[in-house]
Amino acid sequence: MITIQKYVRAQTLEEAWQLNQNKRNRILGGMLWLRLGKGSVNTAIDLCDLGLNTIEETEDQFSIGAMATLRDLELHEGLNAYSGGAVAAAVKDIVGVQFRNMATVGGSIWGRFGFSDVLTVFLAMDAYVQLYKGGIVPLEQFAKMKKDNDILVRLILKKTPCKIVYTSVRNQRTDFPVLACAVAYMNGCYRASVGARPARAMLFCSEKSEGFASFIAENAPTEGNLRGSAAYRTHLIKVLVERAMKELGGM
Protein backbone atom coordinates (compact mmCIF):
# COMPACT_ATOMS: atom_id res chain seq x y z
CA MET A 1 0.00 0.00 0.00
CA ILE A 2 1.15 3.52 -0.74
CA THR A 3 0.86 6.28 1.85
CA ILE A 4 0.65 10.00 1.02
CA GLN A 5 1.76 12.59 3.56
CA LYS A 6 0.54 15.73 1.77
CA TYR A 7 -1.78 16.51 -1.17
CA VAL A 8 -1.32 19.62 -3.34
CA ARG A 9 -3.45 20.81 -6.27
CA ALA A 10 -0.92 22.73 -8.33
CA GLN A 11 -2.14 26.05 -9.73
CA THR A 12 0.58 26.39 -12.36
CA LEU A 13 2.84 24.02 -14.26
CA GLU A 14 5.82 25.78 -12.73
CA GLU A 15 4.53 25.02 -9.24
CA ALA A 16 3.97 21.39 -10.18
CA TRP A 17 7.44 21.15 -11.72
CA GLN A 18 9.14 22.69 -8.69
CA LEU A 19 7.39 20.24 -6.37
CA ASN A 20 8.24 17.33 -8.64
CA GLN A 21 11.99 17.95 -8.33
CA ASN A 22 11.86 16.30 -4.91
CA LYS A 23 12.30 12.57 -5.51
CA ARG A 24 9.87 11.77 -2.69
CA ASN A 25 7.06 13.70 -4.39
CA ARG A 26 4.89 12.22 -7.13
CA ILE A 27 2.53 13.56 -9.78
CA LEU A 28 -0.90 11.95 -9.73
CA GLY A 29 -2.58 10.81 -12.93
CA GLY A 30 -5.66 8.68 -12.54
CA MET A 31 -4.09 7.06 -9.44
CA LEU A 32 -4.85 3.61 -10.83
CA TRP A 33 -1.29 2.33 -11.21
CA LEU A 34 0.37 4.44 -8.52
CA ARG A 35 -1.93 3.11 -5.80
CA LEU A 36 -0.66 -0.42 -6.41
CA GLY A 37 2.84 0.55 -5.35
CA LYS A 38 4.45 0.46 -1.95
CA GLY A 39 6.19 3.08 0.13
CA SER A 40 5.59 6.65 1.18
CA VAL A 41 4.97 9.73 -0.96
CA ASN A 42 5.85 13.02 0.68
CA THR A 43 3.69 15.26 -1.55
CA ALA A 44 1.16 14.06 -4.12
CA ILE A 45 0.85 16.63 -6.92
CA ASP A 46 -2.53 16.87 -8.66
CA LEU A 47 -2.74 18.59 -12.08
CA CYS A 48 -6.55 18.67 -12.16
CA ASP A 49 -6.76 22.50 -11.92
CA LEU A 50 -4.53 23.16 -14.94
CA GLY A 51 -7.07 22.58 -17.72
CA LEU A 52 -5.25 19.58 -19.15
CA ASN A 53 -8.32 17.35 -19.40
CA THR A 54 -9.42 18.31 -22.92
CA ILE A 55 -8.89 17.08 -26.47
CA GLU A 56 -8.61 20.04 -28.84
CA GLU A 57 -8.86 19.57 -32.60
CA THR A 58 -7.56 21.99 -35.22
CA GLU A 59 -7.13 21.69 -38.98
CA ASP A 60 -3.74 20.05 -38.67
CA GLN A 61 -3.54 18.30 -35.29
CA PHE A 62 -5.14 16.96 -32.12
CA SER A 63 -3.89 18.30 -28.79
CA ILE A 64 -4.65 15.78 -26.05
CA GLY A 65 -4.19 17.05 -22.50
CA ALA A 66 -2.31 14.85 -20.05
CA MET A 67 -5.37 14.64 -17.77
CA ALA A 68 -7.75 13.58 -20.56
CA THR A 69 -9.00 10.06 -19.87
CA LEU A 70 -8.85 6.91 -21.95
CA ARG A 71 -12.63 7.11 -22.18
CA ASP A 72 -12.24 10.55 -23.76
CA LEU A 73 -10.03 8.96 -26.43
CA GLU A 74 -12.53 6.18 -26.98
CA LEU A 75 -15.47 8.55 -27.53
CA HIS A 76 -13.83 11.42 -29.44
CA GLU A 77 -15.46 11.46 -32.88
CA GLY A 78 -12.75 13.45 -34.66
CA LEU A 79 -9.90 11.35 -33.30
CA ASN A 80 -11.56 8.10 -34.26
CA ALA A 81 -12.60 9.39 -37.67
CA TYR A 82 -8.97 10.27 -38.36
CA SER A 83 -7.65 6.92 -37.09
CA GLY A 84 -10.41 4.82 -38.65
CA GLY A 85 -11.44 3.64 -35.20
CA ALA A 86 -7.94 2.42 -34.30
CA VAL A 87 -7.67 4.58 -31.17
CA ALA A 88 -11.00 3.29 -29.83
CA ALA A 89 -9.96 -0.27 -30.70
CA ALA A 90 -6.74 0.18 -28.72
CA VAL A 91 -8.45 1.22 -25.48
CA LYS A 92 -11.79 -0.63 -25.56
CA ASP A 93 -10.46 -3.74 -23.78
CA ILE A 94 -8.55 -1.90 -21.06
CA VAL A 95 -10.34 -3.29 -17.97
CA GLY A 96 -13.76 -1.58 -18.10
CA VAL A 97 -15.56 1.71 -18.64
CA GLN A 98 -15.18 2.77 -14.99
CA PHE A 99 -11.43 2.24 -15.22
CA ARG A 100 -11.14 4.10 -18.53
CA ASN A 101 -13.10 7.00 -17.01
CA MET A 102 -10.25 7.47 -14.52
CA ALA A 103 -7.07 6.36 -16.31
CA THR A 104 -5.32 9.33 -17.93
CA VAL A 105 -3.53 9.70 -21.24
CA GLY A 106 -0.60 11.36 -19.49
CA GLY A 107 -0.16 8.50 -17.05
CA SER A 108 -0.38 5.92 -19.82
CA ILE A 109 2.18 7.66 -22.04
CA TRP A 110 4.53 8.89 -19.30
CA GLY A 111 4.77 5.44 -17.73
CA ARG A 112 5.97 3.91 -21.01
CA PHE A 113 4.67 0.61 -19.70
CA GLY A 114 5.44 -2.48 -21.72
CA PHE A 115 1.78 -3.44 -21.71
CA SER A 116 0.52 -0.03 -22.89
CA ASP A 117 -2.02 -0.22 -25.72
CA VAL A 118 -2.07 3.59 -25.74
CA LEU A 119 1.66 3.96 -26.40
CA THR A 120 1.52 1.25 -29.06
CA VAL A 121 -1.24 2.83 -31.14
CA PHE A 122 0.07 6.40 -31.03
CA LEU A 123 3.65 5.31 -31.75
CA ALA A 124 2.59 4.15 -35.21
CA MET A 125 1.23 7.61 -36.06
CA ASP A 126 2.79 11.07 -36.35
CA ALA A 127 2.70 11.76 -32.61
CA TYR A 128 4.68 13.95 -30.23
CA VAL A 129 4.72 14.77 -26.54
CA GLN A 130 5.01 18.24 -25.06
CA LEU A 131 7.16 18.29 -21.93
CA TYR A 132 7.11 21.32 -19.64
CA LYS A 133 10.88 21.81 -19.72
CA GLY A 134 11.87 19.49 -22.54
CA GLY A 135 9.58 20.99 -25.17
CA ILE A 136 8.06 19.01 -28.03
CA VAL A 137 9.64 15.59 -28.55
CA PRO A 138 8.69 12.89 -31.12
CA LEU A 139 6.90 10.05 -29.37
CA GLU A 140 9.35 7.53 -30.84
CA GLN A 141 12.21 9.39 -29.15
CA PHE A 142 10.28 9.84 -25.91
CA ALA A 143 9.50 6.11 -25.72
CA LYS A 144 13.25 5.41 -25.56
CA MET A 145 14.06 8.08 -22.97
CA LYS A 146 14.74 7.38 -19.31
CA LYS A 147 12.24 8.75 -16.83
CA ASP A 148 13.11 12.09 -15.25
CA ASN A 149 11.39 14.83 -13.25
CA ASP A 150 9.88 16.74 -16.17
CA ILE A 151 6.10 16.97 -16.66
CA LEU A 152 4.18 15.63 -19.64
CA VAL A 153 1.77 18.42 -20.59
CA ARG A 154 0.03 16.96 -23.62
CA LEU A 155 0.17 14.45 -26.44
CA ILE A 156 0.13 15.97 -29.93
CA LEU A 157 -1.13 13.98 -32.91
CA LYS A 158 -0.49 15.52 -36.32
CA LYS A 159 -3.19 14.95 -38.95
CA THR A 160 -0.72 13.51 -41.42
CA PRO A 161 -2.80 11.46 -43.89
CA CYS A 162 -2.56 7.82 -42.91
CA LYS A 163 -4.38 4.53 -42.63
CA ILE A 164 -3.89 2.60 -39.40
CA VAL A 165 -4.98 -0.73 -37.95
CA TYR A 166 -4.68 -1.78 -34.31
CA THR A 167 -4.81 -5.37 -33.11
CA SER A 168 -3.82 -7.36 -30.03
CA VAL A 169 -4.01 -10.80 -28.47
CA ARG A 170 -5.26 -11.24 -24.91
CA ASN A 171 -5.76 -14.36 -22.85
CA GLN A 172 -9.04 -12.85 -21.71
CA ARG A 173 -10.75 -9.71 -22.89
CA THR A 174 -9.89 -7.26 -20.10
CA ASP A 175 -6.41 -8.61 -19.30
CA PHE A 176 -3.11 -7.02 -20.30
CA PRO A 177 -2.22 -7.89 -23.91
CA VAL A 178 0.02 -10.86 -24.65
CA LEU A 179 1.10 -8.81 -27.65
CA ALA A 180 -0.09 -5.49 -29.08
CA CYS A 181 0.44 -4.25 -32.61
CA ALA A 182 -0.41 -1.16 -34.66
CA VAL A 183 0.45 -0.80 -38.34
CA ALA A 184 0.05 2.46 -40.28
CA TYR A 185 0.73 3.49 -43.86
CA MET A 186 1.90 7.10 -43.95
CA ASN A 187 3.99 9.17 -46.36
CA GLY A 188 4.66 6.12 -48.53
CA CYS A 189 6.02 4.13 -45.59
CA TYR A 190 4.71 1.32 -43.41
CA ARG A 191 5.08 2.00 -39.69
CA ALA A 192 4.57 -0.92 -37.30
CA SER A 193 4.70 -0.57 -33.52
CA VAL A 194 4.90 -3.70 -31.40
CA GLY A 195 4.08 -3.55 -27.69
CA ALA A 196 3.70 -5.95 -24.77
CA ARG A 197 6.83 -7.82 -25.90
CA PRO A 198 6.52 -7.50 -22.79
CA ALA A 199 8.90 -4.51 -22.92
CA ARG A 200 8.14 -0.99 -24.21
CA ALA A 201 6.63 -0.68 -27.66
CA MET A 202 9.11 -0.46 -30.55
CA LEU A 203 8.63 1.16 -33.95
CA PHE A 204 9.74 -0.34 -37.28
CA CYS A 205 9.49 1.40 -40.66
CA SER A 206 9.74 0.13 -44.23
CA GLU A 207 8.81 1.37 -47.70
CA LYS A 208 8.12 -2.20 -48.82
CA SER A 209 5.45 -4.53 -47.48
CA GLU A 210 7.12 -7.73 -48.67
CA GLY A 211 8.96 -9.45 -45.84
CA PHE A 212 8.18 -6.65 -43.38
CA ALA A 213 6.36 -8.88 -40.88
CA SER A 214 9.16 -11.46 -40.91
CA PHE A 215 11.78 -8.74 -40.47
CA ILE A 216 10.02 -7.37 -37.38
CA ALA A 217 9.59 -10.85 -35.89
CA GLU A 218 13.31 -11.49 -36.35
CA ASN A 219 14.43 -8.15 -34.90
CA ALA A 220 11.97 -7.31 -32.12
CA PRO A 221 13.31 -8.70 -28.81
CA THR A 222 10.74 -10.69 -26.84
CA GLU A 223 10.66 -12.24 -23.40
CA GLY A 224 8.42 -14.68 -21.59
CA ASN A 225 6.18 -14.10 -18.59
CA LEU A 226 3.01 -15.58 -17.11
CA ARG A 227 1.00 -14.53 -20.20
CA GLY A 228 3.17 -16.15 -22.83
CA SER A 229 6.61 -17.31 -23.85
CA ALA A 230 9.13 -15.37 -25.90
CA ALA A 231 8.69 -17.81 -28.81
CA TYR A 232 4.91 -17.38 -28.73
CA ARG A 233 5.24 -13.60 -28.81
CA THR A 234 7.67 -13.78 -31.73
CA HIS A 235 5.16 -15.91 -33.62
CA LEU A 236 2.36 -13.46 -32.79
CA ILE A 237 4.37 -10.53 -34.11
CA LYS A 238 4.54 -12.05 -37.58
CA VAL A 239 0.87 -13.06 -37.53
CA LEU A 240 -0.51 -9.75 -36.25
CA VAL A 241 1.62 -7.57 -38.52
CA GLU A 242 0.59 -9.62 -41.55
CA ARG A 243 -3.09 -9.39 -40.58
CA ALA A 244 -2.88 -5.65 -40.08
CA MET A 245 -1.11 -5.13 -43.40
CA LYS A 246 -3.71 -7.21 -45.22
CA GLU A 247 -6.40 -5.02 -43.69
CA LEU A 248 -4.49 -1.97 -44.91
CA GLY A 249 -4.29 -3.51 -48.37
CA GLY A 250 -0.53 -3.89 -48.32
CA MET A 251 -0.38 -7.66 -48.84
Regions found by a protein language model. Give the residues of each.
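C-terminal structural segment of proteins
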Residues: 1-251
